[in-house]
Amino acid sequence: MYTYQDFLKAGSIRDGIRSAIARHRVSEEYKTALDADLYDRQMNTTINNYVQVIQDYSGNPVVNANAANSKIASNFFYRLNTQLNSYLFGNGVTFAENDEIKERLGQDFDTALAEWGYYARIHGVAYGYWAVDKLHVFKLTEFAPLLDEFTGELKAGIRFWSLDWGRKPQNIIFYEEDGYTAYQLDPDNDADLVEIHPKRGYKEIVNTTPADGEVIVGEDNWNGIPIIPMYGSRLKQSTLIGTKEAIDSYDLIQSGFANDLRDCAQIYWIIQNCGGMSREDLQEFLARIRLDHVATADTKGMGVESSSLQPYTQEIPFQARSAYLEQIRHQIYESFGALDTSTISAASQTATEIKAAYQNLDQEADALEYQAIKAIQALLALLGMEGTPVFNRARIINEAEQVQVVMMEADYLDDQTVLELLPNIPVDKIDEILERRKLQNGNLFENDQEQPENGFENPFESENE
């Protein structure tokens, strides 16, 4: 690992930047992140790079160009990571009894947070850059961190990108605690880094006048570097690790089954005592059978063995492969801590059974939520604020059972709480419903009609009570 202390030992800032990028691009974490991006796009490397090899007469391996080469890549990696990310971040984040924090973070914070958490999972770590009023996400494949050897904290960082690495110009931004500097490197002229603009502060002081419009009159910085790491779990590693082999096994077996169906003739013919027929004669004979579905054979030989024609069918093993594929699929979901929705039918499962099915997913979500809370609180500390992030997880429920439970408790709850607990009531409709109920209740009281204490009739209450 190339640390901040290693960077300081470089001959110059430009040499340190180039060394840091070069070391980062050959690290195992970077290579794993690149693989994770490919699996995330269903471009699974193992099955896509697979070729069938046979041995020639000399025993040397050669590519079998005549064999079927179907490459069926599964989409497990994207689906499982998306499931966890949507489960935890799908409803955004709120802050207990402090709406000012959410307003300060901006209306795009929830979507940026979901992206931040997703890349933290598939890469092992992702970095959030706070640009005055908006959060930007830096992936591990485009950001080289410079960590302090003694504290492990981020002291500086280098973001790098190019439309075509090695052919198009490389754009580089060097982030330090007291500002950032932009560089560019032309691959056709492998000279020193060219400074595009000198170091600038992270916060610009702008003065607006009718004559000149907005004019930058000064700069300022935060108390530290405004880049916060979020780790995918306490292991600080990609979710591809430990999952890749199971996905590859599933892909190879599934693709191999398709290739066997193409390579193996399901019906073939054995023609006996017709050795004098040439290849062309055999092909013509087979064509006549396919066309006429009739063949003649001399079964009464004159002192010689008679000829015969016998069809054979071939069946590809199916049951064993299907059972093994199902076993691997179950293992992938179990090891990943995901929810297999095929095992849940909300119409037939009780709330307790559904809750039990979410156990593994809840544990994985807890691990990611802990890391997300740490990252968000570090961001709030940078902004001089304090707050506790709260996540409302989205899960499958038995709506009929939950409605029944809520209505049984309605006598002890106020109107707004009842509406918030009902699963079939949209959140944005609650205020509108409460307002209409106030008008309705007012009309009822004017007509001297009896009104329940909380405004809700309980359909589960016995008429005799």
Show where each model-derived region lies.
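Extended, helix-rich architectural segments
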Residues: M1-F138, F460-E465
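Conserved aromatic-histidine-acidic binding/catalytic patches
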Residues: Q5, Y39, N64, W116, ...
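Short glycine/proline-rich turn/loop motifs
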Residues: L80, G92, S306-E315, L439-Q440
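Short amphipathic alpha-helical segments
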Residues: E97, I101-D108, A112-L113, G242, ...
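Extended, regular secondary-structure scaffolds
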Residues: G117, I122, Y127-G232
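Extended, charged amphipathic alpha-helical segments
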Residues: T209-Q349
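C-terminal helix-loop subdomains that flank or include functional centers
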Residues: A287-K300, I316-E465
